[in-house]
Amino acid sequence: MTKVTTDVAALILRLAAGAIFLPHGWSKVAGEGGTAAFAADMATNYGIPTFLGHLAPWTELVGAILLIVGLLTRLDALLLAGTMFVAAFIVQLPEALYEVPPDAIKSFVVLRAIELPLAMFAACAAIVLIGPGRVSLDALLRVEERFRALLPKKKAAAEAAALV
């Protein structure tokens, strides 16, 4: 794969994921009861801490915008991947297993319940791995280069580890 195709793939993934997350995040933030209603539902029905119930909608909404423009992309995609992992396996999967109609094919019902959060988890994981690409604010502002400059150099890290 060439650098250009990787950049195009990253752009397509970012735009598609952002376009999907944006209305989902907005509906939770601006919907009836806002994040408080969403957080209460997550705490009551799924045992998810209220703080995370408040954080998830904002992660989806702000994360969508950051993905689309390609700013803080790897961190953003990592947070969104975590949110989608919880959505797929803690919220959707148990509910699907519990509420399968008697005449339904169980595996299809379960897959259908988790397919969107699972696909979004995969998209975000791919973005974490390939990065934002050159068509992003991260590339324009050299965010990843600046972050790497803050990290200890390999030699210094090895020397520090040898002291321990």
Residue ranges of predicted features:
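Extended, low-polarity transmembrane helix blocks
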Residues: 1-30, 50-57, 62, 69-164
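Short polybasic/polar patches that bind polyanions
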Residues: 42-44, 67, 128
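Membrane-interface interhelical connector segments
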Residues: 29-50
